[in-house]
Amino acid sequence: AVPLNFRYTSDEIDYCLKLADVDVLFFGPEFIGRVEAIVPKISQQMLLFFVGDTCPSFAEDYHRATANCSSMAPKVLIDDEDEAAIYYSSGTTGFPKAILLKHHALAQSARMEAIHHATTHNDVFLCIPPLYHTGAKMHWFGSLFTGSKAVLLKGNSPQAIFQAVSSERCSIV
């Protein structure tokens, strides 16, 4: 997995995709213009899947492609030392820098978050995006570790946060 910063320009997206040797790109409506700008450079190297309502002509429709897929988990053996994800720095001093994380590191992060927040299966965690950054995602891992509910916040205003906490009965924010 290689989550990308929603603020990246087309050139930064192109740079990160090539550096990570990406085979498949999933993107939503907010990325259409920036992905379209680099299609001539990337379309021969990777599959492009659009996740949204109106799929652009240069991509495949994710929902249509997955409509008849099996719900069975794929039989893929994963070792703790296998590479799991590449996260990128913000790129404030130039192009983003890649940080490679292994499964062991992500599993340990999930365990530590669950311990830190004393998360139980009955908790409800409010996950505040953006998810391209390890900060929000690593906090979310504690609820994944315990099998508790997580709510992905839509918006970032105080009102949206209070509304989500109230309506979803969030116990960890």
Segments (PLM) and residue ranges:
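Short beta-strand->loop structural element characteristic of the AMP-binding/adenylate-forming
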Residues: A1-F26, A98-L100, K149-G155
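Adenylate-forming
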Residues: C16, L25, F27-E36, C55, A65-T66, S89, K154-Q159, E168-V173, ...
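Conserved helix-loop-beta element of the AMP-binding
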Residues: D21-V24, P40-V51, V124-L126, V151, ...
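ANL superfamily adenylate-forming
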Residues: V24, I32-D80
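Conserved S/T- and glycine-rich ATP-binding loop of Class I adenylate-forming
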Residues: L25, E83, S89-T92, F125, ...
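Conserved pre-ATP/AMP-binding loop-to-beta segment of ANL
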Residues: A67-Y88, F95, A118-V124
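Conserved AMP-binding/adenylation subdomain of ANL enzymes
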Residues: A107-V124, Y132-I172
